[in-house]
Amino acid sequence: VSIHGYAYVADRYALMNHGASMGEGYGPRIVAREEMHLTDLQKGKGKRLAIPGEWTSAHLAAQMCIGEYDYGLVEFDHIPDAVERGEYDAGVLIHEGQLTFEEQGLVLLEDLGVWWGQETGGLPLPLGGNTVRRDLGDLIPEVSRLLRESIAFGLDNRQEAVAYALGFGRGL
């Protein structure tokens, strides 16, 4: 779950000790068809930003960076196409789109992980974390153990794990 979104579900879900996405000098990216200043995206200036969700850490970081802006909700893997077609002036990219946007001729306006690091003296940008339903009670330690073992297996068998994960990569 996104760290921003976690605030809205913390009464029902607990953050787990294992597994998180932290952007260290890298994070969600704001892209556009053409160069523009981020202040051009501020609310009331006639520009719209495609975002992957209102509760995403990417949206919160973009708001902190830009200030308030006009936006539309677009499925994260459709944002590059929506920006390329001109449906939006810019977009906040997460996941694979962060790596492939240049192939569509889009330009980087800001890497929010880099921006966050500059603003915070080098702290990583908290993006997402693994959660477990609080009502699972006595099962939570078992879920935690299994997740820890899965992560350890992936780290011990990186080539096999990456090959498997690439099967789920959209556009990679």
Where in the sequence are the language-model features?
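Glycine/small-residue-rich interface belts in oligomeric ring/scaffold proteins
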Residues: 1-35
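Short linear Ser/Thr-Pro motifs
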Residues: 2, 55-56, 150
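Short loop/helix-cap segments at secondary-structure boundaries that form the rim of catalytic
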Residues: 8-12, 62-63, 100-103
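Conserved beta-strand segments of alpha/beta enzyme cores
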Residues: 14, 70-72, 107
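Hydrophobic/proline-rich hinge and linker segments of small-molecule sensing/allosteric domains
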Residues: 22-40, 64, 117-135
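Bilobed "Venus flytrap"/periplasmic-binding protein-like clamshell domains
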Residues: 28-89, 96, 163
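Pocket-lining segment of extracytoplasmic ligand-binding domains
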Residues: 74-165
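Short glycine/proline-rich, acidic loop/turn segments that cap or connect secondary-structure elements
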Residues: 167-172
